Amino acid sequence: MSNKINPKRREPTVAAAVAAATAVVATNTSSSTGSSAGNTSSANTSSSSSSSLSSAGGGDAGMSADLTSLFECPVCFDYVLPPILQCSSGHLVCVSCRSKLTCCPTCRGPLANIRNLAMEEVASNVKFPCKHSGYGCTASLVYTEKTEHEETCECRPYLCPCPGASCKWQGPLDLVMQHLMMSHKSITTLQGEDIVFLATDINLPGAVDWVMMQSCFGHHFMLVLEKQEKYDGHQQFFAIVQLIGSRKEAENFVYRLELNGNRRRLTWEAMPRSIHEGVASAIHNSDCLVFDTSIAQLFADNGNLGINVTISLV
């Protein structure tokens, strides 16, 4: 049996939101009229408006909290944000869930492309909590700022940065290193801003990853060397450094990778990636040190490749 949500719970919710939006508009109109009539009239209007808001939700904070709950999607419990569409009975569902549904999850009626302008007006006057509030974020934002904030929120959960491990772990930034040390014990950590990253057996067939940690300046950096087959028989190496930290922290550093030997030198210098961003997109766009197997053989010694890594403060 499917868990059908009682439609009666949503209908008064939308009605309450419309009433609240009307109250807000009425309050603004009354305040404007009272102001033009004089100070005494303005004071009376202000008192009346304050009383009205208080009864609606216990003041501005209470009202905002009450209204926010009206925007919960009945499927995923995230917020339904503008543009807001409703079914023919007035029930709401978020855009993400709507694309996966064939009928309204509340009344099982047909989904319709009907804009709910009243709810959109309410949404423009409500502040929504960050979706990472469970990880400690206390920000409250208008809906137009919500997505941008959440993409760079310092409290957002981080994915495991270890490439090729298919690790499903995610958690707060301050637990990333603990996870790596407990679950990926094979990763070696070297101290200092100048180290040699030694990748062994680079002639192994297929896609291979080499990973090492570097600790300096009070931070940890993950050094990654990936070998991929880009197209038939043509293999390439991609070397990159990412900071176990935020994007803002990464802006304080620059890393330098250098292959050196046999009177040849190949270098790359850039700002480290944050684990917010990961390394996949940088590798896909070749925004890192890139060289093919023939270049690798010029610097390799018995199948082993040493990469000099230098981390510097900007």
UniProtKB/Swiss-Prot annotation:
Zinc fingers (SIAH-type) by residue: 125-185
E.C. code: 2.3.2.27
InterPro entries with a match to the protein in the record: 7-in-absentia-prot_TRAF-dom, SINA-like_animal, Sina-like_RING, TRAF-like, Znf_RING, Znf_RING/FYVE/PHD, Znf_SIAH
Region annotation SBD: where it falls in the sequence: 122-314
Subcellular location: Cytoplasm; Nucleus
Gene Ontology molecular-function annotations: ubiquitin conjugating enzyme binding; ubiquitin protein ligase activity; zinc ion binding
Pathway: Protein modification; protein ubiquitination
Main function: E3 ubiquitin-protein ligase that is required for specification of R7 photoreceptor cell fate in the eye by mediating the ubiquitination and subsequent proteasomal degradation of Tramtrack (ttk). E3 Ubiquitin ligases accept ubiquitin from an E2 ubiquitin-conjugating enzyme in the form of a thioester and then directly transfers the ubiquitin to targeted substrates.
PANTHER family for the chain: E3 UBIQUITIN-PROTEIN LIGASE SIAH2, E3 UBIQUITIN-PROTEIN LIGASE SINA-RELATED
Domain notes: The RING-type zinc finger domain is essential for ubiquitin ligase activity.
Subunit structure: Component of some E3 complex at least composed of sina, ebi and phyl. Interacts with eff.
Family, as annotated: Belongs to the SINA (Seven in absentia) family.
Name of the protein: E3 ubiquitin-protein ligase sina
Taxonomic source organism: Drosophila virilis
High-level lineage: Eukaryota, Metazoa, Ecdysozoa, Arthropoda, Hexapoda
Name of the gene: sina
